[in-house]
């Protein structure tokens, strides 16, 4: 399954909505996503699975790439 992750790049900073980035990761579960991203210093805000029409919509965006972790 593909997950969309909303995050702040610096864990030590207070989250600011305008600085939120997103990335896509293929994983078995939300816990697997957290495990794969644990070595990065990201402040994970929200993790959501995407599929079906939502995935098709996201794939149309020019910045859509699934990270290989």
UniProtKB/Swiss-Prot annotation:
GO BP terms in the entry = DNA-templated transcription
EC number per UniProt: 2.7.7.6
Statement: the UniProt record of this protein carries the keyword Transmembrane? no
User: What Pfam family is a match for this entry?
Assistant: RpoY
Signal peptide annotation: none
Could you confirm whether the keyword Transferase appears in this record? Answer: yes
**What's its catalytic activity?**
RNA(n) + a ribonucleoside 5'-triphosphate = RNA(n+1) + diphosphate
Superkingdom of origin organism: Bacteria
Q: Which GO terms describe its molecular function?
A: DNA binding; DNA-directed RNA polymerase activity
Keyword annotations from UniProtKB, A to Z: DNA-directed RNA polymerase, Nucleotidyltransferase, Transcription, Transferase
Tell me which GO cellular component terms the UniProt record holds: DNA-directed RNA polymerase complex
Q: Describe the function of this protein.
A: A non-essential component of RNA polymerase (RNAP).
Q: Which family does it belong to?
A: Belongs to the RNA polymerase subunit epsilon family.
Instruction: Summarize the subunit comment.
Output: RNAP is composed of a core of 2 alpha, a beta and a beta' subunit. The core is associated with a delta subunit, and at least one of epsilon or omega. When a sigma factor is associated with the core the holoenzyme is formed, which can initiate transcription.
Protein name from the UniProt record: DNA-directed RNA polymerase subunit epsilon
This protein's species is Halalkalibacterium halodurans (strain ATCC BAA-125 / DSM 18197 / FERM 7344 / JCM 9153 / C-125) (Bacillus halodurans)
User: What gene is this protein a product of?
Assistant: rpoY
